[in-house]
Curated annotation (Swiss-Prot):
Catalytic activity: adenosine(1618) in 23S rRNA + S-adenosyl-L-methionine = N(6)-methyladenosine(1618) in 23S rRNA + S-adenosyl-L-homocysteine + H(+)
Superkingdom of origin: Bacteria
UniProt keyword annotation of Methyltransferase present: yes
Organism of origin: Colwellia psychrerythraea (strain 34H / ATCC BAA-681)
Extent of the signal sequence: none
Lineage, broadest ranks: Bacteria, Pseudomonadati, Pseudomonadota, Gammaproteobacteria, Alteromonadales
Main localization category: cytoplasm
One GO cellular component term: cytoplasm
Pfam families (alphabetical): Methyltransf_10 (PF05971)
GO biological process, one term: rRNA base methylation
Keywords tagged on the record: Cytoplasm, Methyltransferase, rRNA processing, S-adenosyl-L-methionine, Transferase
Name of the featured protein: Ribosomal RNA large subunit methyltransferase F
Amino acid sequence: MHKKNRHNQGYNFTALVKAHPGLLQFIIKNQYNNQDTIDFANPQAVKALNLSLLKSEYHVKFWDIPDGYLCPAIPGRVDYIHHLQDLLAATPKTLLPNKTPINVLDIGTGASCIYPILGQREYDWHFVASDVDPISIKVAKHIISSDKSLNRNINCRLQPNSNQIFNGIIAEDEFYHLTICNPPFHSSLAEASKGTARKIKNLNKGNHSSKNQDKTLNFGGQKAELWCPGGELAFIGKMIKESKAYQKQVLWFTCLVSKKDHLSKLKLSLKKSDAKQIKVIDMAQGQKISRFIAWSFYDVN
């Protein structure tokens, strides 16, 4: 994990239960080391853990999402935020317009609105949080309206056209230092279901409980969160094409890339689009390696 990640040392379940007593019912023993953990294949357990973390570490008093919506793991999400800050810090000052605060566009914020919440709490960034799902936007608005700082810094916008990403969201007079995105990885519902089942099987290896092995879709996630025609390669490809129209309004476009094999094709697309800077930033959470691709139409010189 990033050196600034608050969760580098694992979870302090005593403190987490104190922050949110509802977590206690989900704590179990890991069968290999007998340490406290939760069943990460149980979305209710992950939801309770998230609320505990948000309360204890980020001072967010209210956070709730409907059943069936993606419940993100906070340590990995905040890692993306810290690496984005590193990206900005490494950017020549001549490319950083004298505009404060830092403005960020989150594509596909989801009902959890997790990236804007973490970005506001860690760096006081300002966000536009967009999504194609009206329920996600409604829930996200409800969450941020309960906190003055979040409400001041985060603006939720519905994307009315599911075939568009930046179009219809970025206004003519707006400038963003960053765009961020956790794209739909899979190309079909069947592929998404297989991926979820595989994750559940792997997670259950470390727990006594195996009762969740048949809950194939219980990780949560609506269609737009999990899959789209062509999967992440097609989605990011569309993002690259649209980004050209906003090359003067965005300093860094970024997007998570699940499959490393996609990087070569994405880099080629970016070169054809005349991107001036292309970066791939690796992130590690335990044995898991994730990454995001970043591009800019601003020349480093």
